Amino acid sequence: NNTLLDFGCGAAGFLLKAKKIARKVVGVEVEKRLQSHFKQVGLQVFQDLSELRTHMKDEKYDVITLFSVLEHLADPRTVLGELSPFLKDDGQIIIEVPNANDALLTLFKCEPYSQFTYWSCHLFLFTAETLRDLAVQAGFSVNYVKQIQRYTLSNHLYWLAKGKPRGHEIWSFLGSEVLHEAYEKQLAAIGHCDTLVASLSK
């Protein structure tokens, strides 16, 4: 029965899944070329928060999500603050970002991976600490910041051996759920997973 706002929804893959279980889903996406796609699949997606406010008035949401979005924003603190009025008093914001303390960057110091990462379109890289600080500066309480490892050990080994991506596909023979869970648990314990997921509230 929850309502959801996905900020920076891209092609709306998550919204389409959420639509099956949420009472109402709404998106914000700046890419104009996707508007025809949103209409085709029956989604309400606005180009910015101003347009959302105009059409949805004072509507507030149980959950606001930002998946792989915050690191692309020129002023993430301001944007988080602007999202606050759209969040219900007992709602939460879920943020997913790459971890600046990714093991390949800071533990293994893989130069090809560093070049691959730092030449991307990310304007910011967050650690668990800087993500917490940003949330507090934007006026939120932090419920948690979790370490999540998206890429497998085979991906990391391939980067270290070959200096290239897609190791999880090319060396898929090393793929094992048990192995991945153990690797993720160990990286999380020392703060070096590749992804951070945070929950914020008012």
Segments from the language model and where they lie:
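Conserved SAM-binding loop
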Residues: N1-C110, S120-Q137, T195-K202
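Hydrophobic anchor at the start of a short beta-strand
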Residues: V25, V142-N143
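Short secondary-structure boundary/capping segments
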Residues: Q35-S36, Q115, A188-A189
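General small-molecule cofactor/ligand-binding pocket signal
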Residues: Q44-F46, N143-K146
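Phosphate/oxyanion-binding loops and surfaces in catalytic or ligand/nucleic-acid-binding neighborhoods
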Residues: A100, Q137-S141, L160-G163
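Short glycine/proline- and charge-enriched loop/turn segments
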Residues: K109-Y118, W159-G167
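Flexible, active-site-adjacent loop/turn segments at secondary-structure boundaries
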Residues: S114, C121-L123, K146
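A C-terminal cap/extension of S-adenosyl-L-methionine-dependent methyltransferases
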Residues: K146-K202
